[in-house]
Amino acid sequence: MNALTLPDIARQTTLSTLPLDWVGMQGIALPVQVAGQTVAAEADAGVSLDDPQARGIHMSRLYLALAGLEDGELDLPRLRGVLQRFLDSHADLSRRAYLRLRLAPLLRRPALVSPLSGWKRYPLVLDTRLENGTFQADLHLELTYSSTCPCSAALARQLIQERFAQDFAGQQPDHATILAWLGSSDGIVATPHSQRSSAQLRIGLAEDCAGLPLEELADLGECALGTAVQTAVKRADEQAFALANGQNLMFCEDAVRRLHRALRGYPQAREFSVRVVHAESLHAHDAVAESHWQRGAA
């Protein structure tokens, strides 16, 4: 008995002729290797459907090509290779291939002073595309940090000065008395407000960038801000964090400018955008600032 040939409906033509910008799948579960660890990722994979007569693409071919990302460290040549397989398997249908990966790798981060360390999550999105032999990759990275309001800090200092003048009116306190007063609840009568804040970085990676610069960009951004949220801490680390906040007072405008300056000096960026959000503890709304830069632009 002869085996039946299974029908391939995707090869049929359509009566409604129209090329499509993107056809594919989203939310595909996929393990990838990042920074020496296996990370659960979600992939959106697709190609353009440029043949207006074709009814559809071969989605299973895209799905199977993603297996090329499972073994070995995730890097840009590997991503480009997968996109090329997308196009090779749709040579008569498609000219453009797309792949987006959403993942949240963990990086071990040291405490500020003590020998402790802990894991921190870094939400990451990789957008890649291939068209006419040109490969482009954009990396989206979210950083979390603390921001202390400069205005609130000035107001708190003023209240401390007023309390000092009130408590020592007509007196000439000695050094020990002032030191004891500063260490009491009577001395520090007000503190500035601060909040957990986030920075969304989108970096268009240069053509000669091969590796995935997750840790490099995380270090660059956190160093520029100076107040990255911590993992495991002792009291000495908490005190160092309080000092860092006091020495890095920031409006959202200050934070975005710090990050912008740092990324301008990053050689693997062909362009970038920065968006910071300060989830105000004083207000019921957020403070937001954005900037953008493109290499070679005026």
Curated annotation (Swiss-Prot):
Catalytic activity entry: GTP + H2O = 7,8-dihydroneopterin 3'-triphosphate + formate + H(+)
Keyword set includes Hydrolase: yes
Protein's UniProt keywords contain Chloroplast: no
GO molecular function, one term: GTP cyclohydrolase I activity
EC number: 3.5.4.16
GO terms, biological process: tetrahydrofolate biosynthetic process
Name assigned to this protein: GTP cyclohydrolase FolE2
Source taxon at top rank: Bacteria
Pfam families: GCHY-1
Pathway: Cofactor biosynthesis; 7,8-dihydroneopterin triphosphate biosynthesis; 7,8-dihydroneopterin triphosphate from GTP: step 1/1
Keywords: Hydrolase
Functional summary from the UniProt entry: Converts GTP to 7,8-dihydroneopterin triphosphate.
Enzyme superclass (EC): hydrolase
Marked site positions, May be catalytically important: 149
Assigned protein family: Belongs to the GTP cyclohydrolase IV family.
